From Swiss-Prot:
The gene is menD. This is 2-succinyl-5-enolpyruvyl-6-hydroxy-3-cyclohexene-1-carboxylate synthase. It comes from Chlorobium limicola (strain DSM 245 / NBRC 103803 / 6330). Pathway: Quinol/quinone metabolism; 1,4-dihydroxy-2-naphthoate biosynthesis; 1,4-dihydroxy-2-naphthoate from chorismate: step 2/7; Quinol/quinone metabolism; menaquinone biosynthesis. Pfam families: TPP_enzyme_C (PF02775), TPP_enzyme_M_2 (PF16582), TPP_enzyme_N (PF02776). SUPFAM superfamilies: DHS-like NAD/FAD-binding domain (SSF52467), Thiamin diphosphate-binding fold (THDP-binding) (SSF52518).
Amino acid sequence: MNNREITSLWSRIIIEELVRLGAGFFCISPGSRSTPLTVAAARHPEAAWKMFPDERSAGFFALGYARATQKPAVLICTSGTAVANYYPAVVEASMDCQPMLILSADRPFELLETGANQTIQQFGIFGGYSRWNFRLPEPSSDVPLRSVITAIDHAVSSATGSLPGPVHINVPFREPFEPLDPDLHDPWLAPVSEWIDTSTPLCRTLSQERVPNRESISSLRKIIAESKLPFMIAGRLNNRSDSLAVGNLARSLNIPLYADLSSGLRLDSSFNPLQLAFQSSQFPERFRPDTVIHFGGPLVARQPSAAVRMWNPRNHIVIKPHANRFGPDHNITLSIEASPALIAEALLGCRTPLPSGCQPLPEPFFQQAKAEIDICCLPDHPVSEISAARIVSSLVTPESGLFLSNSMPVRDMDLYASPSASRPFMTGMNRGASGIDGIISTAAGFAKGLRKPVTLMIGDIAFLHDLNALSLLPSLQVPLCIVVLNNNGGGIFSFLPVASEKDVFETCFATPQSYSIKAAAETFGIESSRPATNRDFEECCRKAAESDRCSIIEVKGNRRNNVELHRTLQSKITALGASYLSR
């Protein structure tokens, strides 16, 4: 068997085992050194794949796909700086425990650190952000094929195990590496002949949910039963079963629940949005739970964590599915690594439901706060960043998805969304490292993984940051509606103290831009609109939801007016809360 045959077979075996293990979606970027892997993936009858001229965009697309499916997409790239472009997406995936697999083709060992063209030190490039790094040997009949297959088995296991995240496999190839059908009767294949004749992986890892032990459940039930005023927080929950179980627990025991936007429960109409209550500084002073039970990951807003820090409750319990460290305030008294759904189900019936008087604020407060927000959404009023969030939240359904960019879009949706859903639905956001890079690519991957229409809300700077990702949309096969909140710059900085530094604020922080969103959409063949009123905006959103094509809706705003609207509305809600708390 010659080198071309060995290399072709080597690559086909890698791709075959990945497909058998359920990692059958490939994000491929063109390149010469990765030819064997690309051809093997493209020709596999059960593999799905998409091409990405930009590896950075590919990395974020794979991240979004993982968020939607909890399965790793496989990234394939050539040698050199190509793999380095995955770095931002790898950081986000690692920080937020999202599975990802990277196959980077490389030059052979003898060319490393010799000045050879397109050759860098690729192995270990992601440092501590990778769950496992491995360098396969150059394809050779001296290498047992079973060792190659089991390396792939371990890679998938590491990416999807108890602490999911990115895994990097470096795959060096010597020339020539053009594909050539190998001799399948070669003696080199004898040790894997049974594997070839089946469709099952050589070695499967049977991972199981982190099951709570009896002692954990017993301790938790006792703590909650003896608590005078328990309080629940739902942080980031990665699947619908966790969201359903946590929501059911709060409802059955009538325990007040702070549902973060990333929990999937923020838009559940059976829970009042406590984000509004936390706008009043008096609220955490008057409402003092003795037990806080936090399910899942971190929160979008700072106020709840600040309140817990001030409360210093006797019991501060965190239930999280992974072994990553969590708790920047260092005030957790009990940390349990287990499935949030299993814990929540095991706590049902642990005490009699709390009386209605134990809720943080009475129902009329939330109704009046809702009325204040809804004034911003009157049909003939100009569409604003607040009304856009409110309207989008009222239109999304469990049959669709929602993705939020960092900076103001995620904060506005968390605070001003309208609870209108009857059950949890998928909400995506990159809150591991909270960057604004790669948002369109991530949302596109999220839509691909969900196989459902998705609405993305994004600011103009984040939109421009990932502009080339618009090239992915015409062939996405799933409608993605991008709502661009265009306030001519970085709107969030207008809320920060640096806004008073007049000599540097506009040029160094707000960074105003004058690019045409419409022209960008036209360049990539995407329909766009710019509604002026809330009525027009809602009509555009409904039209986008009924379409099978991707679209862009531009909400043109003014940063100064936006700050004024936010502060006016916030002061009204704060005053409203204070009036109820003083009674």
